[in-house]
């Protein structure tokens, strides 16, 4: 994502690792994925599903270098991204936390499942420093709770959920009017995190 100035002109200099300026607490690496309402449209702008997948892949493998830009110093979100050592993926701050689930929209759900499990296992724990960054209105813990259940609301306000990789063999959500939503993950284990087939009320779900 390349920013424009106040007159609607493209900025004359682009550095994908530059924080600040047009990007709040992040860089182009993070805000490029903020088309939560239209992942398919984003993929077409990027040249299709394969091209978008390659860009997502590169976020996790690129050097975790940075330019602190208009901030003028290394803010804690930058320091956390470097410490997490997952390329340019900065789970310690909220703007990019949904990006892992975008693989679902471009036909590569196993990559969502892989990265979701990696983040839950590597960046969260029950100790005094159990969060990998700031919490900001409960988003970082909400990401974990949804991901542990096996699904995630990529676009706020839309009653749709992207599928991840449930952490538990079985969990039950108690819904209004005495109803339950039960998630069963047969054969679930840290090494067996990929979903071979999903059923919803007995019918195959994709």
Where in this protein do the model-derived segments appear?
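Active-site core of glycosidic bond-cleaving carbohydrate-active enzymes
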Residues: 1-182, 187
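C-terminal beta-sandwich/jelly-roll accessory domains of carbohydrate-active enzymes
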Residues: 187-206
């Amino acid at each position: 994502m390349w920013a424009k100035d106040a007159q609607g002109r493209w900025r004359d200099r682009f550095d994908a690792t530059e924080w600040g300026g047009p990007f709040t607490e992040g860089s182009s690496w993070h805000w490029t994925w903020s088309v939560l309402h239209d992942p398919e449209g984003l993929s077409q702008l990027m040249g299709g599903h394969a091209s978008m997948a390659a860009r997502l892949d590169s976020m996790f493998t690129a050097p975790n270098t940075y330019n602190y830009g208009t901030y003028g110093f290394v803010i804690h979100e930058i320091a956390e991204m470097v410490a997490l050592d997952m390329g340019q993926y900065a789970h310690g701050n909220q703007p990019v936390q949904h990006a892992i689930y975008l693989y679902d929209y471009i036909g590569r759900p196993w990559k969502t499942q892989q990265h979701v499990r990696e983040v839950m296992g590597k960046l969260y724990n029950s100790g005094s420093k159990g969060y990998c960054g700031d919490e900001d209105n409960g988003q970082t813990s909400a990401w974990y709770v949804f991901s542990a259940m096996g699904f995630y609301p990529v676009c706020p306000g839309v009653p749709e959920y992207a599928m991840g990789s449930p952490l538990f063999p079985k969990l039950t959500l108690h819904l209004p009017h005495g109803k339950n939503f039960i998630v069963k993950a047969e054969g679930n284990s840290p090494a067996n995190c990929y979903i071979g087939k999903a059923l919803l009320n007995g019918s195959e779900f994709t």
